[in-house]
Amino acid sequence: RRGSPQGGSHTTPHPDRLTPSPDDTYDDDTNHPNGRNNSIEIVPQLPPDRPLIELGVATLRKNFMEASCTVETNSGLAIFWKIGKPSVDAFNRGTTHTRLMRNGVPVYALVSTLRVPWLNVIPLTKITCAACPTNLVAGDGEDLNSCTTKSTTIPCPGQQRTHIFFSAKGHRAVCITSELVSQPTITWSVGSDRLRNDGFSQTWYGIQPGVCGILRSRFAFTAPPGALDQHQRTISVRSAHRTQRRAITKCYPTPTQLPTSL
């Protein structure tokens, strides 16, 4: 268990805890002007009941992961966060008190917000917000049976994107797809003609802090794929992924990009 639940910073480092960048000192919570605080925040006493809890994760200004945890409750609570197993002790957090309308009835709610630079977060890791009684100071490995928790998977920082580039002479094409949760299967086609798999190579870059997977596929045109006029020379890249719907991305080259002979 940790010591005092009143805030401040830990003096004993934890080997597997997330570590912030020394430059990340912003903070929107006026209660914590230094932008650093424990992952535990004590809130006032409110009526007893099992709180309702909602959790959302989004990207803020491209560089930050922002998680927001809303707890509807009238009881005294300690709110804390975990990313994976470690507690989130050193990143910018803030709690605000507000009232929400639920079925036309105003309810008391607490909103805890966590901001972490994406470079300190590995996408697809579980993030958890826990609302615990004030007499329980939860930490790493603490039993959370008496807490109300909500977990979700941290998404990729951005939406999946696919770009196709042509060489100056038009005899090579490169397809780069980013923000992938795992390596997909790629097929190339020109018009309605599917190209043989022995004509291209691909490189996979796995998930890293702040970045989901990237697949780079390169195709060299070694023979004409068929009698196609310039308006029909459309490159299609089809990526199939087990956990995502099938996505088809087409590239319509400008006249200066069109190969004279494929």
Curated annotation (Swiss-Prot):
Tree of life domain: Viruses
InterPro entries: Varicellovirus_Gp2_glycop (IPR010278)
Annotated membrane topology: Single-pass membrane protein
Alphabetized UniProt keyword annotations: Glycoprotein, Membrane, Transmembrane, Virion, Virulence
Gene Ontology BP term (one): viral process
Subcellular location: Virion membrane
Chief site of localization: virion
Record-level GO cellular component terms: membrane; virion membrane
Region of interest (Disordered), residue spans: 1-45
Function: Virulence factor.
Protein name: Glycoprotein gp2
Origin species: Equine herpesvirus 1 (strain Kentucky D)
